[in-house]
Amino acid sequence: MARRRKGRAIDGILLLDKPLEISSNQALQKVKRAFLAAKAGHTGALDPLATGMLPVCLGEATKFSQFLLDADKTYIVTAKLGVRTTTSDADGEVVDTRQVNVTEQQLIDACETFKGPIKQVPSMFSALKHQGKPLYHYARQGIVIEREARDITIFSLKITRFEGDEVDMEVHCSKGTYIRSLVDDLGQLLGCCAYVSKLHRTAVADYPSDKMVTFEMLESLLEKAQAEQIPLTDILDPLLIPMDSAVKALPSVELTPASRDSFLHGQPVPYVSEATIDQGTLVRTYCTEGNVFLGVSELDSDNKAAPKRVVVFTEQG
């Protein structure tokens, strides 16, 4: 018999504003404890050095976290010129120092070369796996593993400040982009070295930054809940964003109430859509009764919606 999870069956997404010097997993566990959630997962780790948007999926929302892992990201990064480190950030050991004789125009021209589809070699100090172990495991032992360059896209790279040996940039990029590697590559192209001194993620997909929640906000609300005996459902749960927001880039279809249970049990069912959608497309799937989100399906050759990720409802409604 499967062991029952402890905690509340709460579903939704919290846009956490991750603070400095805490790992993404530590941040996740703090959120999980605050909400007394039975299940939680994040959608792409931020380094301890990095701050900013970390979407935390609770409950059934964890089934759709991959869509946020695959989403575009936006960062504000401060690069320190003239120094190269082992990790390409402020936590690493200095391995090279050079004089900075870079003009603003040279910086602008260098940034232009990184825009669009490019190849990027991931840092050795990354969580990418080699023979089952993260690359940083080997890097800490002084072992260098050959890494293949990966396809990424830099949609925009804007210089917002250039003073002395510091550069602030806003980067809008595809999944799989390592900002530390981008800054290190920029430093090499400029001939003066560079590393990341500050990194803040402002957006995942098109989630607005003003919806982010800090730990201070959570702690204040928890104290209020305890002092005034307010249920968590009334004080914390309104902070959550609906789980279907993770897949809102997908087109949507609807099912009749008669088809709902069959769909939730894994059977392809007929669907209704106002738009023409190609076979093989992943779609958000709703019940026409109450516009309830049921999950993600794939449209098959029989003009049916075949379930791929379905929501398990703790209560029928």
From Swiss-Prot:
GO molecular-function term, one example from the UniProt record: RNA binding
Protein's job: Responsible for synthesis of pseudouridine from uracil-55 in the psi GC loop of transfer RNAs.
Record's keyword annotation contains ATP-binding: no
Keywords: Isomerase, tRNA processing
EC number of the protein: 5.4.99.25
Family as reported in the entry's similarity comment: Belongs to the pseudouridine synthase TruB family. Type 1 subfamily.
Listed name of the protein: tRNA pseudouridine synthase B
Active site residues per record: 47 (nucleophile)
Pfam families: TruB-C_2, TruB_C_2, TruB_N
Catalytic activity: uridine(55) in tRNA = pseudouridine(55) in tRNA
GO BP term, pick one: tRNA pseudouridine synthesis
Domain of life where this protein originates: Bacteria
Organism: Pseudoalteromonas atlantica (strain T6c / ATCC BAA-1087)
Gene: truB
